[in-house]
Regions:
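Short, low-complexity, intrinsically disordered N-terminal peptides in bacterial proteins
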Residues: 1-25, 124-132, 174-178, 192-194, ...
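Non-catalytic accessory regions of SAM-dependent methyltransferases
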Residues: 1-55, 59-62
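Conserved AdoMet
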Residues: 36, 43-121
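Glycine-rich helix-loop-beta junction characteristic of Rossmann-like nucleotide cofactor-binding loops
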Residues: 119-128, 246
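Conserved class I S-adenosyl-L-methionine
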Residues: 129-137, 157
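S-adenosylmethionine
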Residues: 140, 150-296
């Protein structure tokens, strides 16, 4: 019997609260940092309940059907191997969105929600009746779709090089009438938009090649091309700096997500390329998370 089966050996827990405790313990034994949260999300996924509804049901002493408990056992065993929760449920929350995700696409992170807010603010402040926003390397489409849905007067364009990731982005953005998605290279995409964009934003690959992320969910499951940005992690950012200058109108804003230790190097890079008003911004954990600059 594998560790993944331990919580369900013998008689299944009869109550939802007992099953929640057993699942959380199984995930804690597997080394997960938030086992209770993951257990609640897995059980909620099986039962079709939100976390609040699930917690209320556990307090009431609700019981769970055997078939649902067995389905949960299989999903919890997968999570105990460090398969991403989002791959198991097939979805990832992002701001007001629920995105479809799975193998072949980078899972959107909560910290990116703050980064896209800067782009949304710039679009909302634009004097243009239909400002143009461009997402370079859109992955799942999270950033592009957030801009398109929260600033409906904007015209949003997104490019993704990976066919696998592009397929996920196409699924997520299919109903966004003000969003254009293309499969292609961010270095050459959208030539027809030169000099028109109010905002160019990217969450590019920025992990240095020698710094393999420690979390199995990241280094085993996130696409390699979405993680690594060359020896210093800045190879793709260098390309974006040059391309964004061509796409933005004078005074247009570039928004770049990056690792917490890269702000100074990126500001120096952007300054050398002729950008102005470069600034690095912290996320909610007080770590440097994004750098902005204005086109000359």
């Amino acid at each position: 019997m594998t560790r993944g089966d331990d919580a369900y050996a013998g008689r299944m827990p009869e109550s939802l609260s007992a099953l929640l405790r057993a699942t959380a313990q199984q995930l804690a034994d597997a080394g997960l940092t938030d086992p209770v949260v993951d257990a609640e999300l897995l059980i909620g996924h099986v039962l079709g309940l939100g976390r609040g509804e699930l917690q209320a049901a556990a307090i009431r002493g609700d019981r769970i059907e055997q078939a649902d408990a067995e389905r949960l056992a299989a999903l919890a065993a997968r999570r105990a191997t460090r398969e991403p929760l989002q791959h198991i449920t097939g979805t990832a929350p992002f701001r007001q969105l629920e995105l479809a995700v799975g193998p072949g696409v980078f899972i959107p992170r909560p910290e990116t929600e703050m980064v896209v807010q800067m782009a949304i603010d710039a679009l909302m402040e634009s004097a243009s009746p239909s400002p143009v926003a461009i997402d370079l390397g859109t992955g799942s489409g999270a950033i592009a779709l957030a801009m398109a849905t929260e600033v409906p007067r904007a015209r949003v364009f997104a490019v993704e090089r990976s066919p696998e990731a592009h397929a996920w982005a196409a699924r997520n953005t299919v109903d966004a009438e003000n969003l254009t998605l293309v499969l292609g290279d961010l270095a050459t995409a959208f030539d027809e938009l030169r000099g028109t964009a109010s905002v160019v934003i990217s969450n590019p690959p920025y992990v240095p090649a020698s710094q393999i992320p420690s979390d199995p969910e990241v280094h085993l499951y996130d696409p390699v091309q979405a993680l690594y940005g060359g020896e210093d992690g800045l190879d793709v950012i260098r390309v974006i700096s040059r391309r964004a200058q061509e796409l933005l109108h004078p005074g247009g804003m570039l928004v770049l997500e990056h690792a917490e230790h890269q702000g100074a190097a990126i500001r120096e890079l952007l300054h050398a390329d002729g950008w102005r008003s470069t600034a690095t911004h912290e996320d909610l954990t007080r770590r440097d998370r994004a750098t902005t600059a204005l086109n000359r």
